[in-house]
Amino acid sequence: MATDFSLVRLEDVEQERFPELGNRHRKLTEPLGCTEMRVNTVTLGPGEATTPHAHERQEELYIALDGGHLDVDEIRHEVPEGGVVRLGPDVVRSVRNESQNEEQTWIMCGAPPVGTIDDFGEYTVPADDD
């Protein structure tokens, strides 16, 4: 019988808001008991986007539960519902919801589980060229 196993329903984990943008997220790392990765969800309302960022040492997988758009090094990609994207550490990424009236949720997994920035791992935000 498997003992190193966990199951979490998204609706059972409290949803919080990012202080900067107000996007909603759920931290799943602790409820799942993950030790080798971080797991979060981000839910975007129409017109919302995450802050463009990169990770110094963390590879990520993004799973688009409802589809959406992903900017990778300033190039926009349409990701279908259920699409899975791998992002290397140095790639600048941002997810966005371009729909008019639908929410979009992404599951985001990062490994290794480095850093302590509000439990989201080490990340860098590109400098504004303005």
Describe every region a protein language model picked out.
Residues 18, 72-74:
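Structural motif
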Residues 43-45, 54-71:
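Short, conserved beta-strand element in jelly-roll/cupin
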